[in-house]
């Protein structure tokens, strides 16, 4: 029987966007393994999630042109990011507030037609990487780098973040990470976005709701804590003793186990492969080697295997992404899935309004205040 507490295993909606079954993840009918084996680009996957079919060459070209046309953010938005970057705010709070501001500055934000919603979706998808890269550089005292319309989604983000053109391997790694995190059925942030969409609120409010939900440590932030752990282990010096100490203290080891997958997370192996390829023969190899030792120890001690968060920490670090903004990268990818669910909810909408089971006291009588 499904659990009421946390709604585990309860079915809340029908969807054609993604499915998790028999420990496999599929996007609109395409197994994630098939997309990975064929090196599907993130733009293709965004199109797939929003349209429920893979694009033709012409459709993909037109879709990419729309995205690239909308990469840039206004001076007003950049100024708002600058102000926030000086306040030592949580990175997810900055993203949440800036996405909300995108809605404020879009004079057509309140339009609800299919065409208007699609245009708003394109703008959100295209501008969020620029917002993140701008924030990441400003908080380090660096000047923002303008996006390049001749670069694809993954390459453009890494260029804006690091100030140099990424290698083909780096582009592949970024694309893979984005595709693997793009969508994951009815997780907490996606459900929150659908609840908001069911009220017929605007898409900026729906995405802001999702970002606020992802900010919570029980949903987002796991790979950030994985890399913090790897740093601690490097200083500690011994993987086995470190893990045993944590386990004895009943502390959770981040990057292991999953709420839905009972055996292996089907996304994990692709990020493990990318972590190995990116670090091979470089100064970053220590992070991959530490990760492998942790993986082996956790298998021996707890019979647990890594999830998607574990090796993504090393991948992101090698790509020049600071661990404090790892969850922003999660959001940059997952916004594609959020938008797909928002659009699906609005096409066949019914207000999401569940009931609660009251467990408090009953039949109490009012007592005047002077007698209490």
Curated annotation (Swiss-Prot):
Pathway: Carbohydrate metabolism; tricarboxylic acid cycle; isocitrate from oxaloacetate: step 1/2. Gene3D superfamilies: Citrate Synthase, domain 1 (1.10.580.10), Cytochrome P450-Terp, domain 2 (1.10.230.10). The keyword Transferase applies. PROSITE patterns: CITRATE_SYNTHASE. GO terms for molecular function: citrate (Si)-synthase activity. Citrate synthase is found in nearly all cells capable of oxidative metabolism. This is Citrate synthase. The gene is citZ.
């Amino acid at each position: 029987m499904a659990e009421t507490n946390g709604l585990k295993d309860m079915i809340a909606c029908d969807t054609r966007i993604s499915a998790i079954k028999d420990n496999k993840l599929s996007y609109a009918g395409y197994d994630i393994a098939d997309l990975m084996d064929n090196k599907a680009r993130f733009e293709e996957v965004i199109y797939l999630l929003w349209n429920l079919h893979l694009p033709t060459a012409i459709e993909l070209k037109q879709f990419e042109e729309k995205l690239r046309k909308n990469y840039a953010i206004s001076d007003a938005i950049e100024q708002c990011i600058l102000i926030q970057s000086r306040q030592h705010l949580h990175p997810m709070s900055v993203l949440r507030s800036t996405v909300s501001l995108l809605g404020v500055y879009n004079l057509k934000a309140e339009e609800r037609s299919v065409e208007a919603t699609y245009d708003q979706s394109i703008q959100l998808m295209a501008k969020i990487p620029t917002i993140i890269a701008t924030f990441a550089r400003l908080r380090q005292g660096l000047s923002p780098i303008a996006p390049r319309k001749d670069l694809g989604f993954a390459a453009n983000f890494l260029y804006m973040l690091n100030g140099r053109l990424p290698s083909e391997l780096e582009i592949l790694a970024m694309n893979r990470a984005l595709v693997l995190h793009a969508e994951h059925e009815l997780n907490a942030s996606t459900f929150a976005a659908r609840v908001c969409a069911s009220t017929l609120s605007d898409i900026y409010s729906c995405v802001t709701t999702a970002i606020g939900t992802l900010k919570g440590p029980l949903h987002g932030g796991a790979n950030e804590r994985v890399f913090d752990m790897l740093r601690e282990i490097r200083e500690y010096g011994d993987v086995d003793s470190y893990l045993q100490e944590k386990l004895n203290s009943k502390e959770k080891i981040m990057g292991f186990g999953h709420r839905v997958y009972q055996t292996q997370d089907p996304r994990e192996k692709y990020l493990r492969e990318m972590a190995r390829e990116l670090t091979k023969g470089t100064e970053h190899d220590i992070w991959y080697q530490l990760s492998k030792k942790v993986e082996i120890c956790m298998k021996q001690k707890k019979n647990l295997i890594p999830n998607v968060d574990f090796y993504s920490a090393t991948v992101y670090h090698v790509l020049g992404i600071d661990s404090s903004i790892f969850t922003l990268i999660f959001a940059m990818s997952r916004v594609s899935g959020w938008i797909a669910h928002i659009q699906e909810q609005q096409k066949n909408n019914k207000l999401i309004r569940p009931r609660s089971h009251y467990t408090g006291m009953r039949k109490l009588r009012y007592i005047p205040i002077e007698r209490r």
